[in-house]
Amino acid sequence: MAKIQLRNIGKSWGSFVGVDNFDLTIADKEFLVLLGPSGCGKTTTMRMIAGLEDVTEGEILIDEQVVNDLDPKDRDVAMVFQSYALYPNMDVYENIRFPLKVRKTPKAQHHERVMKAAAMVELEDFLHRKPAELSGGQRQRVALARAIVRKPKVFLMDEPLSNLDAKLRVSTRAQIKNLSHELQVTTIYVTHDQIEAMTLADRVVVMNKGIVQQVGTPTDIYDNPANTFVASFIGSPAMNLVAGTLEAGIFKTQNMEVSGFDRFPDGQVTLGFRAEDAKVSSSAAELNIQVYSLELLGDSTMVTARVGESLVAVKAAKDYSVAIGASVGIHITASICHLFDTQSGQRFKEN
């Protein structure tokens, strides 16, 4: 098992900065998710940890040892890729066994370790099939077993569910969560999918344009986003964000007025609130809108309206019904809201 320390690491190509001043300690046995949009630097960060990319600045330590100059094979990490990376000429058994042969593990251990890894991902009945005879989910499980059989200090998983359909993603996600609990190996997982991040992680690192935006537990990041980028990236739907003016403790914008912000400074601000925290009303309220769309989600109905240049979503009961274009009120209180500085995007903390 291993603790990983990233000491102000950075990666640049000429004037382009891919990862900037990334500083973090990852605890032994922690499941850490690097989350962000394409091009944010999350995969580059993982590749630096693996040794597949050189570090431009800073240090990477695994178990207190600086590994900047170590080859990937000497870092004792195992990677699982989006593309599975299986050998088509080998059956499942030999694909799983291959890392043991490369690392010259005593042959007497091979069969037991392969069978144990295969059992963990429920592949015992597929050991003599070639990759072409497997489904996408089964291939990804072979890739997981091949990483498990190594018994590495660290698992690195780069968008391992991206090629799977929605149903397989759910079941494989649950399997990864279960394996993490069973194996107790430090794991770094890269994804652009905030649902994967929220369901799998002990902690989430949200990245954008090579910069860490926030580090915290999934609950922390959902309930207390550090800035408007995190607020708009986490949640389905994302947090509602409405620009307006704060004066004498009252937030005002088109068709909207919310009081109770006396401890915040006056100025141009952005109000944020979650869809499930506001309430739809047939009478006048803090926000008065015309319904833009209704979406039945099964357990609830999503009511969407336009406020200025923003779309605002609010969850209502599953049997809620109203005509498109009808006027409704949305009850919002200061206690469910966050205020962000409109210029910097940073969330205000109470004075």
Short names for language-model regions:
Residues Q5, T25, L61, G329-H331:
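ABC ATPase nucleotide-binding domain
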Residues F31, D69-F229:
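ABC ATPase nucleotide-binding domains
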Residues L35-P37:
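The feature captures the beta-strand-to-loop junction immediately N-terminal to the Walker
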